[in-house]
């Protein structure tokens, strides 16, 4: 009897993932000043991509390009693998890309529920003869309260002015608003800037929760400690150029800190 050599079965290869949001060799120039040079970046569902850098590194230009505020001078923006020409932040939001800027786009004297529904107001009944229908305040209050609670944010009262909340609470409300209204990827502009340890921890826990919900998160920060607490992927910008592109498994906190020195 002749032994037959058996070829082991091939190990199935994982299909390549498609990023929710990506930049392909993007350059952004303002006249002769190149603010962002040949930037390539991929943001995947269920991952936190941290973009670090000092002032003037190009972080603000990156945010404006990803959010649809500015068009790239060269290169491509892709959503779900398809090249898109984002015309505005509203266009980006319609495609599931939402940005929470440092100013949070909140109206301080308005209650929490009004800020939660800002731009998404629910009215009672149809709009007859050009007349503005009244807001369905009770529906929006109930939904705001239940939506925040479902995301682990338990505010005693959503009818108080949002200015009465702590900085960390305002941040998580702004992030929760983006999640509730359909964001698949969220861009967070220095969400822990000027916050204390406790408030920063609140925001970072919510970033982790957004990741666990399957969102792609871009965390813009100058704080490597905060980045390493939640990050899966780290990008370091300097003078508009990518100086580091590393996965969490490829870099230690000490190495990340040293790169920023």
Model-predicted regions and their roles:
Residues 3-5, 15-261:
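Glycine-rich phosphate-binding loops of nucleotide-dependent enzymes
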Residues 9-13:
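Intrinsically disordered, low-complexity terminal tails and inter-domain linkers enriched
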